Amino acid sequence: MARKSQTIFVQIAAYRDPELVKTIENMIENAKRPQNLVLGICRQYHPEDGFDNLDKYREDKRFRISDVLYTDAKGVCWARNQVQQLYDGEMYTLQIDSHMRFAPDWDVELIKMIKDLQKKGIPKPLLTGYVSSYDPDNDPKGRVQEPWRMVFDRFIPEGAVFFLPETIPGHKELDIPVPSRFYSAHMCFTLGEFAEEVQHNPEYYFHGEEISIAVRAFTWGYDLFHPHKTLIWHEYTRKGRTKQWDDDSTWGDKNSHSHLTNRKLFGMDGEKQEGHEGIYGFGTERTLRDYEEYSGLLFSKRAIQQHTIDKNYPPNPGISDFKNEEEWIESFSSIFKHCIDVGFDSVPEKDYDYWVVAFHGEDDKTLFRKDADINEINSMMKDPAGYCKVWREFPTAEKPKYWVVWPYSKSKGWCDRITGNL
């Protein structure tokens, strides 16, 4: 498809979002060339909301709006896929959420970053990241100005990879984006054909979306980068927004199917690899193993290289840096990191001595135990959300099957044993 010069196809999947109209207005107001913007929007709406009404844009030829009644919505990845069907040959594409803010001339700045990277011999750069935050109740004063990058956090029990944002080190001295291992669905700017080549799998629900797109983009020949300056802001708290799962009683089934689809894509936890060759699978420019070498993640073992743990930029030491592939694999560590949420109502006593905190594998064998002492318990009891967040991290070659929290009270002795499957 011939690309329309300098145009940007903006992808927005919005679910009952009071920030949608403000996001659109701020984007257009701060674009240097607003005439080059084409907005594809999947507006998932409730008839009684009103705050996301887009009627004033419907005669504007730059807008392609798909209205979906909230009861027909199937999740964010499904909605993003709907938007991608509206692509029509624009030169660039920007995927964002419906709660964002923009710096002046953001459009030409992003295009310049792409062109600067192409001049360095990178044909398909992709700019992405967990961009810095803003506060709708204190904007623009509440905007974080430092640019952020994404670093590895953990493999969650269901198999998806989680990331954390942090400030890009030395960003003030940078004049070009920095390499990234990961992809963020709330900010991605790249060549327009990305909307056709790496479409969101509508069978994904939420978690797993970003790591699967990162790998698929890489195998399609895209090189991932974080912008070295802040041009776009994101609202992270979800305060005042109804989420799709709030309205969908079957969201749990969708979520479980999504996690299974993701594990099959990567062949994790003994699952037979499926989906890697289809329309929502991997590209032909690079392989999954190429991504694992680049990123320092080994999906089949839920393992990670120290280079990635240390937050060093990719590429990681690859197979060619070792005697053989076996030695390269041995350079990975399987680290299990998990947060156990224990509601205050499950631990009502006031005189706990300690809590047993343990993780068990096959045949109920204990893989790891580190008890919570009185200081940790008292600290957790201050959580404003009403949950004790029991974080544990440990090396293990075997994925735990379940956890146990077993409180001991000075006056009552052993209390109710609390367990949860993983």
Task: Annotate each PLM feature.
Residues 1-289:
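Catalytic cores of eukaryotic secretory-pathway lumenal/extracellular enzymes that build
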Residues 139-140, 162-175, 179-189, 241-422:
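Terminal low-complexity segments of carbohydrate-biosynthetic enzymes
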